[in-house]
Amino acid sequence: MRQMGNLRSSVYEVVLERLNRIFSDFDNVYVSFSGGKDSGVLLNLCIDYIRQNKLNRRLGVFHIDYEVQYEETTRYVDRVLASNSDILDVYRICVPFKVTTCASMYQNYWRPWEDSMRPLWVREKPENCYTKEDFDFYTDDLWDYEFQIKFAEWLHKRNAACLLYTSDAADDK
């Protein structure tokens, strides 16, 4: 429990306070959802908050689909997005940007969803995904982390003020 003045609050209570502030101060909130545990908890906290407080609003979800990922992760992502489609605006990204790899001695990057490699794709693109044609900023030189920044700028132009809420396990101390 953390000390707040003379009050003691649980982590959950502090999260609810933060969500109250976020959903009060920002018209457009979106969550970065990888399908992992941390981002899954964050997304579900936001979904639960919207439902429990009967907010008349939608929540954006930014999901980079890297094509090659655990099958169970893909099923989990599909399940969460489908079961909450009534309140989610999903940005499922299937773009052939550069992604760092250590699986090759000859290449330092690979490209998910690269059209020229379609016969080797692990699976087909999901329905209603966003592709490189949807983004005027896309170039073949773009790395995945650069895409994330440019996506935020792109979304800001479309929706005015936005807040991206992320869960970064690498930041956990």
List the model feature ranges, each with a label:
Residues R2-L7, L55-C162:
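ATP-dependent adenylate-handling ligase core
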Residues M1-V29:
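Active-site-adjacent "lid"/gating segments
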Residues I22-L55:
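A phosphate-binding catalytic loop at a beta-strand-loop-alpha-helix junction
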Residues Y165-K173:
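Single conserved hydrophobic/aromatic residue that forms the stacking wall/gate
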Residues L7-V15, G35-L42, Q69-T73:
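Phosphate/oxyanion-binding active-site loops and adjacent basic polyanion-contact surfaces
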Residues E17, G36, I149-E153:
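A generic local structural motif
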